[in-house]
């Protein structure tokens, strides 16, 4: 729209020059155009929350040349359009602070260029009203602006006398009844230098940030970088949160993957803890202890994801617009400590399992297993405490969890020791592979069977080591390219300044597929542990024993109940028999006594006879 407007102005100027050949324009004056309906109005004022030209206008904003323009079938004031243009100009100047001098003067000049002071013809040359005419910026002012900031020459051409006359502008008002000076009405150009010199020491450069960047005061402790704000030097503009490396759809895919896979892995890890740590009473081995502790540590990692998604992932990572979470945010500090403890403890036990496996295969007598437990726990606690004490737990930009982001801390307290541990694990795995190869020659069937039993723990350690190796490579690849990523932010800003939006402009970051796989590997360990150990024969036997013991216990209780019932029945039956026997005995005795009595009576009777 602005280009069309400039073209029309150029066309009108050509017509005026051709038609006005008989008029003699003064040297040093530009040719002006009179727009019917133009008015001298007060400055409409700055937008709320965004200072622009208040206190920077030549005449204090009392009279500004104003017209009405038709845009999308709506009449819009030229002042409103100028506010849009001046905001874009200020946004560009904000990012030129380290390349230009005296930008404050440039802002004064741009304000007068876009909000031209307005003069009215005196006396009235029309019956009803004065003719309103703009005062243009002097050429010397334009040249000073371009001299201080050569980049402005790409947008401003000081040789255009229509905009930047040396002395003033002449307007042909013959159509309006003006006859003096052959109908040419002279309006002097303006030079804000004197006004600028009087108040410049009381003014500051106005900074403006293109959307979606946000403007913050970096000198205010509330908005300092250690609070989670990422500033774009030399400005006070901060990047959005999360980092605009990817589209909103791509970020959503990462969030959905993490949410789904973390939930599944957490359940799988809890299953392993329940199986090998709680229900297992008869198979207390070093392997099972390693499985339990690895599952516990990795469950802690996935618990942080459950907390995040319950809290709201975007609210968790970005508590405020433009600010990423830091350790002072309670949720970030707690989950960061849990994440570091869990991931470090898992690495320690992966190394421990590989050592135990190697020693078992090589028949090497291992020192007390509890030494591993003490060492792994102390190391993990110490590194976690150091990071918390240094307040290094942050969400950062372009990540989906709170953890340590400072290069030397994360290398010293995580990647270096864990890299050494994984190297030991890989060495032990190599020894196991070599031993399996030797045993596979059928030297001893019994020993071969023993070695083959170690395939699952070997697979687990190999998978964990391989996954961590990818994470290791990805991390250092990102660190290697971090400077190029930072340099590419300039292209992102240029895209925004050129009229781009958050849907079309992006910063440069790690390849999206690699980024997605990085977080996939971190969240797949729980499923991996379950697929190797949770479905093993040992796990099935543990559950079978638990179920069998429960069934046997219930059967035993049932049999005991039946036995007690039978005992009661037998006692009752015995009592009845005794009663019957007693009665029979009594009846027999009575019968005998009766018979004896009869016999006795008979004998008596016989004796009597």
UniProtKB/Swiss-Prot annotation:
<feature type="topological domain" description="Extracellular">
    <location>
        <begin position="21"/>
        <end position="259"/>
    </location>
</feature>
<keyword id="KW-0325">Glycoprotein</keyword>
<keyword id="KW-1133">Transmembrane helix</keyword>
<feature type="topological domain" description="Cytoplasmic">
    <location>
        <begin position="281"/>
        <end position="288"/>
    </location>
</feature>
<dbReference type="GO" id="GO:0016020">
    <property type="term" value="C:membrane"/>
</dbReference>
<feature type="transmembrane region" description="Helical; Name=4">
    <location>
        <begin position="366"/>
        <end position="386"/>
    </location>
</feature>
<feature type="topological domain" description="Extracellular">
    <location>
        <begin position="310"/>
        <end position="337"/>
    </location>
</feature>
<keyword id="KW-0812">Transmembrane</keyword>
<feature type="transmembrane region" description="Helical; Name=6">
    <location>
        <begin position="458"/>
        <end position="478"/>
    </location>
</feature>
<feature type="transmembrane region" description="Helical; Name=1">
    <location>
        <begin position="260"/>
        <end position="280"/>
    </location>
</feature>
<feature type="topological domain" description="Extracellular">
    <location>
        <begin position="479"/>
        <end position="511"/>
    </location>
</feature>
<feature type="transmembrane region" description="Helical; Name=5">
    <location>
        <begin position="409"/>
        <end position="429"/>
    </location>
</feature>
<feature type="disulfide bond">
    <location>
        <begin position="100"/>
        <end position="149"/>
    </location>
</feature>
<feature type="glycosylation site" description="N-linked (GlcNAc...) asparagine">
    <location>
        <position position="198"/>
    </location>
</feature>
<feature type="glycosylation site" description="N-linked (GlcNAc...) asparagine">
    <location>
        <position position="75"/>
    </location>
</feature>
<feature type="signal peptide">
    <location>
        <begin position="1"/>
        <end position="20"/>
    </location>
</feature>
<keyword id="KW-0472">Membrane</keyword>
<feature type="topological domain" description="Cytoplasmic">
    <location>
        <begin position="533"/>
        <end position="609"/>
    </location>
</feature>
<keyword id="KW-0732">Signal</keyword>
<feature type="topological domain" description="Extracellular">
    <location>
        <begin position="387"/>
        <end position="408"/>
    </location>
</feature>
<dbReference type="InterPro" id="IPR050949">
    <property type="entry name" value="GPCR_Fz/Smo-like"/>
</dbReference>
<feature type="topological domain" description="Cytoplasmic">
    <location>
        <begin position="430"/>
        <end position="457"/>
    </location>
</feature>
<feature type="transmembrane region" description="Helical; Name=2">
    <location>
        <begin position="289"/>
        <end position="309"/>
    </location>
</feature>
<feature type="glycosylation site" description="N-linked (GlcNAc...) asparagine">
    <location>
        <position position="172"/>
    </location>
</feature>
<feature type="region of interest" description="Disordered">
    <location>
        <begin position="559"/>
        <end position="609"/>
    </location>
</feature>
<feature type="glycosylation site" description="N-linked (GlcNAc...) asparagine">
    <location>
        <position position="245"/>
    </location>
</feature>
<feature type="disulfide bond">
    <location>
        <begin position="138"/>
        <end position="189"/>
    </location>
</feature>
<keyword id="KW-0675">Receptor</keyword>
<protein>
    <recommendedName>
        <fullName>Frizzled and smoothened-like protein E</fullName>
    </recommendedName>
</protein>
<feature type="disulfide bond">
    <location>
        <begin position="53"/>
        <end position="111"/>
    </location>
</feature>
<feature type="disulfide bond">
    <location>
        <begin position="40"/>
        <end position="118"/>
    </location>
</feature>
<feature type="compositionally biased region" description="Polar residues">
    <location>
        <begin position="559"/>
        <end position="570"/>
    </location>
</feature>
<feature type="domain" description="FZ">
    <location>
        <begin position="35"/>
        <end position="192"/>
    </location>
</feature>
<comment type="similarity">
    <text>Belongs to the G-protein coupled receptor Fz/Smo family.</text>
</comment>
<feature type="topological domain" description="Cytoplasmic">
    <location>
        <begin position="359"/>
        <end position="365"/>
    </location>
</feature>
<feature type="compositionally biased region" description="Basic and acidic residues">
    <location>
        <begin position="599"/>
        <end position="609"/>
    </location>
</feature>
<feature type="transmembrane region" description="Helical; Name=3">
    <location>
        <begin position="338"/>
        <end position="358"/>
    </location>
</feature>
<keyword id="KW-1015">Disulfide bond</keyword>
<feature type="compositionally biased region" description="Low complexity">
    <location>
        <begin position="575"/>
        <end position="598"/>
    </location>
</feature>
<feature type="glycosylation site" description="N-linked (GlcNAc...) asparagine">
    <location>
        <position position="130"/>
    </location>
</feature>
<feature type="glycosylation site" description="N-linked (GlcNAc...) asparagine">
    <location>
        <position position="217"/>
    </location>
</feature>
<feature type="transmembrane region" description="Helical; Name=7">
    <location>
        <begin position="512"/>
        <end position="532"/>
    </location>
</feature>
């Amino acid at each position: 729209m602005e280009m069309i407007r400039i073209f029309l102005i150029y066309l009108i100027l050509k017509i005026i020059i051709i038609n006005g050949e008989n008029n003699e324009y003064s040297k040093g004056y530009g040719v002006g155009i009179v727009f019917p309906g133009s008015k001298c109005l007060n400055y409409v004022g700055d937008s709320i929350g965004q200072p622009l030209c208040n206190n920077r206008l030549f005449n204090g904003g009392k009279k500004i040349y104003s017209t009405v323009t038709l845009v999308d079938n709506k009449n819009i004031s030229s002042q409103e359009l100028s506010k849009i243009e001046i905001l874009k100009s200020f946004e560009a100047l904000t990012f030129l602070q380290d390349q230009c001098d005296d930008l404050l003067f440039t802002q004064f000049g741009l304000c007068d260029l876009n909000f031209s002071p307005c003069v009215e013809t005196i006396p009235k040359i029309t019956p009803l009203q004065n003719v309103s005419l703009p005062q243009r910026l002097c050429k010397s002012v334009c040249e000073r602006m371009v001299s201080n900031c050569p980049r402005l020459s790409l947008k401003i051409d000081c040789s255009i006398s229509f905009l930047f006359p040396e002395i003033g502008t002449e307007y042909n008002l013959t159509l309006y009844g003006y006859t003096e000076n052959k109908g040419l009405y002279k309006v002097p150009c303006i030079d804000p230098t004197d006004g600028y010199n009087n108040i410049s020491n009381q003014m500051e450069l106005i900074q403006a940030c293109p959307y979606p960047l946000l403007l913050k005061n970096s000198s205010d402790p509330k908005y300092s970088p250690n609070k989670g704000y990422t500033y774009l030097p030399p400005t006070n503009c901060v990047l959005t949160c999360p980092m605009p490396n990817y589209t909103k759809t791509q970020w959503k895919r990462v969030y959905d993957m993490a949410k789904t896979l973390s939930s599944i892995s957490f359940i799988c890890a809890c299953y392993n803890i329940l199986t090998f740590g709680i229900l297992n009473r008869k198979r207390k081995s070093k392997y099972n202890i390693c499985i339990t502790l690895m599952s516990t540590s990795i469950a802690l990692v996935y618990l942080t994801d459950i907390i995040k998604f319950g809290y709201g992932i975007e609210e968790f990572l970005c508590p405020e617009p433009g600010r990423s979470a830091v350790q002072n945010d309670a949720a970030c500090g707690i989950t960061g400590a849990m994440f570091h403890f869990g991931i470090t403890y898992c690495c320690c036990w992966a190394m421990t399992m590989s050592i135990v496996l190697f020693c078992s295969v090589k028949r090497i007598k291992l020192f007390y297993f509890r030494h591993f437990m003490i060492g792994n726990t102390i190391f993990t606690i110490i590194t976690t405490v150091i990071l918390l004490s240094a307040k290094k737990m942050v969400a950062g930009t372009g990540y989906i969890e709170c953890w340590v982001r400072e290069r030397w801390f994360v290398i010293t307290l995580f990647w270096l020791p864990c890299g050494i541990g994984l190297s030991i694990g890989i060495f032990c795995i190599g020894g196991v592979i070599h031993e399996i190869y030797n045993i596979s020659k059928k030297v001893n069937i019994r020993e071969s069977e023993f070695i083959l039993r170690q395939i699952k723990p070997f697979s687990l350690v190999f998978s964990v080591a391989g996954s961590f190796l990818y994470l290791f490579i990805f991390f250092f690849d990102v660190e290697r390219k971090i400077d190029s990523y930072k340099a590419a932010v300039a292209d992102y800003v240029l895209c925004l300044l050129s009229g781009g939006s958050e849907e079309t402009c992006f910063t440069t970051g790690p390849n999206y597929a690699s980024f997605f796989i990085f977080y996939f590997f971190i969240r797949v360990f729980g499923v991996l542990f379950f697929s190797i150990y949770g479905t093993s024969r040992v796990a099935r036997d543990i559950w079978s024993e638990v179920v069998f013991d429960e069934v046997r216990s219930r059967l035993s209780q049932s049999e005991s109940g039946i036995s007690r019932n039978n005992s009661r029945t037998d006692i009752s039956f015995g009592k009845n028999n005794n009663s019957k026997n007693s009665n029979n005995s009594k009846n027999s005795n009575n019968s005998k006594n009766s018979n004896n009595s009869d016999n006795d009576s008979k004998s008596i009777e016989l004796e009597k006879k």
